[in-house]
Amino acid sequence: MNQAKKLYLETFGCQMNVSDSEKIVTLMKGMGYQQTQDPVDADLVLLNTCSIRATAEQRVYGHLGKFKSIKKTKPGLIIGVGGCVAQQEGEKLLKKAPFVNLVFGTHNLHLLQGMVAAAEEGKRSSQTDFLDDEKRFDLFPHSEAEGGVTRFVTVMQGCDNFCAYCIVPHVRGREISRSAAKVVEEVRALADSGVTEVTLLGQNVNSYCSKQPGEPDFPDLLRLVAQVDGIERIRFTTSHPKDMSPRLIECFADLPKLAPHIHLPAQSGSDRVLERMNRGYTAQQYLAKVAALKEACPAIQFTGDMIVGFPGEDEAAFQDTMALMEQVQYADLFSFIYSARPGTKAAEYADDATRAEKQGRLERLQAAQKKTTLARNRSLEGTVQKVLVEGLSSTGDSLFGRTGGNRGTVMAGDPSLAGRVLDVKIVEGLQTLLKGEIVHD
């Protein structure tokens, strides 16, 4: 009896990459590969990479060095690199890392099976061509990942915003939206398989179908998905503040299934920096959207992104960012030191702050956010939250789920409760999660 081939897959970066990795698992399963959590056991190692910051690229090359060592003792090991670093580097990656067998870009998952088959025959290859818009979703494979009650559903790909610091339009391509009918069809199929929560994915979901007049826009799509029986909760990410329309804000008031949480990246609180970033809004316009969302849904929780040390940011601009954070009161915040990316407008800007200054600002920002996050979590103590149970916690001795506001919560209970939305009384708010008790009738 032939032993099943083993796949080790490592994913870096955003939720779109996580979604793409689910598709990769499905494709490789079709070739007889089963997943393993140990690269030493693998016959095929694939990295799905991120290039949003230089540190992400450096991590990829660091990991490749680890797999190179494994390949020395296992010459038949196939190593492949996909995602945004692969899209950016292309064949150069094969030259930099001659032990890599294949490189596949963000538009080339439909070619992956053929590339792996060629690698099994000893052939190296690189595929990073962008697909035409009309072909992109027709050729892009779908995930058939098994298990779990939450799932990502891609509704659009690419980005047309060209923020000065961002490489996404260069490695993911221009915006293209999937038809509403196809999205709803996938959501129905997921609901039939036991999924109870879907997250609608795109680099900028707010501009869904903006280039396709006559098609449902994103608020319309949310209302269509909310009609699918079996789906208890809907999330979406990521949102661009400039495209947060009144009709989309109304959805938070009108749709009980829409989770009271939004990831709304500000990136800076300084109007001067926001203009240099080409974000398309001022700090006051951003705060007006936040206020409108809070009015529509008083329980809404905000998460976001902030960049510190962007060219032109001085101490006054940084203090503007701190002031915006204080007004919004983010439940959580992803924050980073600016990293110049090749081909972007900001790469041409003079870098006018020292590394020590940038690091100091980041540490001050993160310390302030840490206090806010803990305070917000503690403010939930004694309240009853709607928690969608996802399954066992990482320790295996309790259940794990998320509140509507996207706060991770652990509680005692039977694993059969996975997929249910339960009333949970929060007994303790910690830095990174909540502890709760299921409220029984």
Swiss-Prot record:
Keywords: 4Fe-4S, Cytoplasm, Iron, Iron-sulfur, Metal-binding, S-adenosyl-L-methionine, Transferase, tRNA processing
Domain Radical SAM core: start-end pairs: 145-375
InterPro entries per UniProt: Elp3/MiaA/NifB-like_rSAM, Methylthiotransferase, Methylthiotransferase_CS, Methylthiotransferase_N, Methylthiotransferase_N_sf, MiaB_methiolase, rSAM, rSAM_horseshoe
Domain TRAM: 378-440
Catalyzed reactions: N(6)-dimethylallyladenosine(37) in tRNA + (sulfur carrier)-SH + AH2 + 2 S-adenosyl-L-methionine = 2-methylsulfanyl-N(6)-dimethylallyladenosine(37) in tRNA + (sulfur carrier)-H + 5'-deoxyadenosine + L-methionine + A + S-adenosyl-L-homocysteine + 2 H(+)
MTTase N-terminal domain boundaries: 5-121
Residues binding [4Fe-4S] cluster 2, per UniProt: 159, 163, 166
CDD domains linked to this entry: Radical_SAM (cd01335)
Cofactor(s), by name: [4Fe-4S] cluster
Subcellular location: Cytoplasm
PROSITE patterns: MTTASE_N, MTTASE_RADICAL, RADICAL_SAM, TRAM
Annotated EC: 2.8.4.3
Superkingdom: Bacteria
Cellular component GO terms, alphabetical: cytosol
Co-factor remark: Binds 2 [4Fe-4S] clusters. One cluster is coordinated with 3 cysteines and an exchangeable S-adenosyl-L-methionine.
GO-annotated molecular function: 4 iron, 4 sulfur cluster binding; metal ion binding; N6-isopentenyladenosine methylthiotransferase activity
Broad class of the protein's primary localization: cytoplasm
Chain positions recorded as [4Fe-4S] cluster 1 binding sites: 14, 50, 84
HAMAP family: tRNA_metthiotr_MiaB
Similarity field: Belongs to the methylthiotransferase family. MiaB subfamily.
Entry function: Catalyzes the methylthiolation of N6-(dimethylallyl)adenosine (i(6)A), leading to the formation of 2-methylthio-N6-(dimethylallyl)adenosine (ms(2)i(6)A) at position 37 in tRNAs that read codons beginning with uridine.
Oligomer and partners: Monomer.
NCBIfam families in UniProt: miaB-methiolase, MiaB/RimO family radical SAM methylthiotransferase
Protein's name according to its UniProt entry: tRNA-2-methylthio-N(6)-dimethylallyladenosine synthase
Native species: Citrifermentans bemidjiense (strain ATCC BAA-1014 / DSM 16622 / JCM 12645 / Bem) (Geobacter bemidjiensis)
Gene from which this protein is expressed: miaB
